[in-house]
């Protein structure tokens, strides 16, 4: 029973960590993309 609870908690924790890392990754990627688009746009103007 205790092992099951521990497994469940660790799984939940891993899931939270994974989503958090994905969010940071996406934000960083979007930021880079946005910066690239902005510089290109400024260059065209």
Swiss-Prot record:
Which key words are in the record? Eukaryotic host gene expression shutoff by virus, Eukaryotic host translation shutoff by virus, G0/G1 host cell cycle checkpoint dysregulation by virus, Host endoplasmic reticulum, Host gene expression shutoff by virus, Host-virus interaction, Modulation of host cell cycle by virus
Metal-binding as a keyword?
A: no
Spell out where the chain crosses the membrane: none
Question: Which terms in the GO cellular component ontology are assigned?
Answer: host cell endoplasmic reticulum
Record flagged with keyword Coiled coil:
no
Q: Name one GO biological process term.
A: symbiont-mediated perturbation of host cell cycle progression
| Subcellular location field | Host endoplasmic reticulum
As for family, the record states: Belongs to the asfivirus E66L family.
Q: What does this protein do?
A: Inhibits host protein translation, probably through the EIF2AK2/EIF2S1 signaling pathway. Promotes cell retention in the G0/G1 phase.
Q: What is this protein called?
A: Host translation inhibitor E66L
> What organism does this protein naturally occur in?
African swine fever virus (isolate Tick/South Africa/Pretoriuskop Pr4/1996)
